Amino acid sequence: MRSDMIKKGDHQAPARSLLHATGALKSPTDMNKPFVAICNSYIDIVPGHVHLRELADIAKEAIREAGAIPFEFNTIGVDDGIAMGHIGMRYSLPSREIIADAAETVINAHWFDGVFYIPNCDKITPGMILAAMRTNVPAIFCSGGPMKAGLSAHGKALTLSSMFEAVGAFKEGSISKEEFLDMEQNACPTCGSCAGMFTANSMNCLMEVLGLTLPYNGTALAVSDQRREMIRQAAFKLVENIKNDLKPRDIVTREAIDDAFALDMAMGGSTNTVLHTLAIANEAGIDYDLERINAIAKRTPYLSKIAPSSSYSMHDVHEAGGVPAIINELMKKDGTLHPDRITVTGKTLRENNEGKEIKNFDVIHPLDAPYDAQGGLSILFGNIAPKGAVIKVGGVDPSIKTFTGKAICFNSHDEAVEAIDNRTVRAGHVVVIRYEGPKGGPGMPEMLAPTSSIVGRGLGKDVALITDGRFSGATRGIAVGHISPEAASGGPIALIEDGDEITIDLTNRTLNVNQPEDVLARRRESLTPFKAKVKTGYLARYTALVTSANTGGVMQVPENLI
C-alpha cells in the first residue's frame, strides 16, 4: 500500500505516534488497513457546499465499514454567484488551480491509498478532477447534488439565472419591486448547486460519462435520500477499487474526453465545461485539439434543453431518467460514444447505463426527435479567434443562424455593464469586451451581468457579445467567449475598433471582423503592449503563469525557468 511509506518500519515510529494522536486509529491493526483521504469542500458561504460536512460523515462511516481508515481534509471554494460582478470574480477560475494544488499537496504528503472527493460547485469540481489526474491515486467522486428549483408567488419556475435576468428587467421597469423581491426570496430554496444546467451541474453530469462517479451523480437532489445512499455506495466502491488498483488515468482516456464533450452537446452544457475539460485532458497527459469538439458536435444530437435555455431544472431531468437515460439514448446511435470503457463502478459505461430509458420525452427528447441534430456547443474560428472561441448555441434563439453587427468596444467588464445600463448599447451592436481573459482579467471573469442585462432588456436577439472572458452557465443569448489568443497576449480581439462590422456565423462556425488584413496589420503596429493589472499576491503569480483559454487556462511554468 502507498500508505506503508508513512506507517511501516521502525523509522516511522514517530509518524505512527502522530497518527495515533489523531484518534482515527482504533486499534494497532488499523495500521494494516488502507488510508483513505476524504477531500471535502465544505464551506458556509456557498449554498452548494453547506451540507457537505454531513455527507463527509456518511462517507467516513462507510469507509470504515468497508475496512479502511478515513481522514478528512478540506479545500477552499468560491461561489461564483456571490463573487459575480466585482473583484471576487477575478479569483474564481484561479481558485481551480489552488484547489488542485492543495489536494495534490495533502494527498502526496501523506501517501493516501485512495481519495474520496466531495465537490459540487463551479471551480471546485474541476479543481478536484485535476488533482485526481495529477496524483493518479485510486479515487471516486460524489458531488453534493443540485438544489430544488424555486417557485415564484405566481407559480413560475425559478433558478439563479432568473434572478440575474430579473435585475435587467427591474431596471427596465418590466417587473415591479414586489415581483423582484419575491424572486429574490424564492429563486434558491434549498442547499445544493444552482438548479439549472449551469457550470456546476454541467461538470457533475460530465463526471458520470467520464466514469468517475456512480450513475445519477449529476441529477439526484442535494436534499434527497438517494444522494446520501450514493455517498455510501461510492465509499464501498472506492475501497474495492483501491484493492484492484483502478486509477483515474485508467478511466479518463481520450475516448472518455470525447464522450464528455458528447454528453455536453446532448445537454447543452455550460461553455465553462470546454475550459475545464481541456484542462483535465492536459493534466491527464492527453493532447486534445479544439477542432475535435466540432466534429463531436456534428454527430451528437441535442436531446435535453435545461434552464437557462428552458424552464426545466436538473430535478426534472432526474425524474425523466437522468444522465443514464441520455447516455443510453446516445449509445443507440453508433459512433456517438465509446461505451466499452471502464468506469469507477468496475463496469463499462455500457453496463452502467444500458436499458435506462427516457421517462419524460418533453424533458429528454429521443434520438428521432432532438431539439437539434447537432450539439448545443460550438467552437468558432476566424480572424478574431484564430485559436478558437466558444458559443452555447443551445442558448441562442433557434431563428438566428448568423448575426452581423457594429462593434462597440470596451476594455473591461465594468465599462460594458455601464454602457448597457445607460442604453449606449443598442440593437444591432456587437459588444466587444476584451482584456478579460485568463491573463488580462486577470482570472478570466464571467460576463453574466452584461449578458443577463442584454436579455433582461429584451435585446437577446438584437445584440451580440464577444469576449476573451468567459460566461456563467446561466448565460444565454448570442454570447461568444473564450476568444483565443486573448487581448492581453496580443490576440486579434485587441485590434477591433468601434464601428467595425463583425459576423458571427453559427452554421459555418466562424467569427470574423470584416476588415482587410492590411488594416488589421497597421492597427497591430500601434497596439500598446499589455501591462499586468495586479502586481502582488496570488493573482500576480497567476497572471505570469496562466495560458490562454484554448489550452484550458492552465498554469504552466515557462521552459526557460525549469
From Swiss-Prot:
InterPro entries: Dihydro-acid_dehy_C (IPR042096), DihydroxyA_deHydtase (IPR004404), DiOHA_6PGluconate_deHydtase_CS (IPR020558), ILV_EDD_C (IPR056740), ILV_EDD_N (IPR000581), IlvD/EDD_N (IPR037237). Mg(2+) binds at D80, D122, K123, E446. PROSITE patterns: ILVD_EDD_1 (PS00886), ILVD_EDD_2 (PS00887). Its EC number is 4.2.1.9. The keyword Zinc does not apply. It catalyses: (2R)-2,3-dihydroxy-3-methylbutanoate = 3-methyl-2-oxobutanoate + H2O; (2R,3R)-2,3-dihydroxy-3-methylpentanoate = (S)-3-methyl-2-oxopentanoate + H2O. Keywords: 2Fe-2S, Amino-acid biosynthesis, Branched-chain amino acid biosynthesis, Iron, Iron-sulfur, Lyase, Magnesium, Metal-binding. This is Dihydroxy-acid dehydratase.
